[in-house]
Swiss-Prot record:
Official protein name in the record: Ubiquitin-like protein ATG12
Position of the Glycyl lysine isopeptide (Gly-Lys) (interchain with K-102 in ATG5) cross-link: G160
Pfam families associated with the record: APG12
InterPro entries registered for this protein in UniProt: Atg12 (IPR007242), Ubiquitin-like_domsf (IPR029071)
Length: 160
């Protein structure tokens, strides 16, 4: 029995990987979906297949991971702006699934604000998020290099 070296492969002049039977063949730009072989995967045009190469093909798989956060608790660091009083403890932890209104409520309680007093909160000293924004989403998008969500607060409007 003669053995061929493992690095030479088949005797064809240009070895190229053969397409897998499990991976769908993208459609050409002028082809219509559903006109070819029946495949359980969604057919894509050639231009779309390049863009969507790394995205999940099944929407349910994407939706399963969409609502989850990497950490259960988010570290929020409060920074006073202008004449706002300093907090004795400027760091707190809040559940990632809570809404930003909980952060506002916590800060108002710590500052001992009256019902009529205004408090303005800004993420990264840049924008005021909506009260129904999820804290975990803000953390994923705007955390600092220490993994903290920095919230600046003021008793008068600032940054805008």
């Amino acid at each position: 029995m003669s053995e061929t070296p493992k690095d030479q492969g088949p005797s064809s002049p240009s070895p190229s990987p053969s397409p897998s039977a499990a991976s769908p063949m993208p459609l050409a730009d002028n082809e219509v979906a559903g006109s070819g072989a029946s495949s359980p995967n969604l057919p894509l045009t050639m231009s779309a297949s390049v863009v969507l190469a790394d995205l999940p093909r099944d929407a349910t798989a994407a939706l399963e991971a969409a609502g989850s956060f990497k950490t259960d608790k988010i570290v929020v660091r409060f920074k006073p702006v202008g004449s706002a009083p300093l907090l004795a403890q400027d760091v707190c932890k809040i559940s990632a699934t809570r809404r930003f209104e909980e952060v506002v409520r916590y800060l108002r309680k710590k500052l001992r604000c009256k019902e009529t007093d205004s408090v303005f909160l800004y993420v990264n000293s840049a924008f005021a998020p909506s009260l129904d924004e999820v804290v975990g989403n803000l953390h994923q998008c705007f955390k600092n290099s220490h993994g903290q969500l920095v919230v600046a607060y003021s008793l008068t409007p600032a940054f805008g």
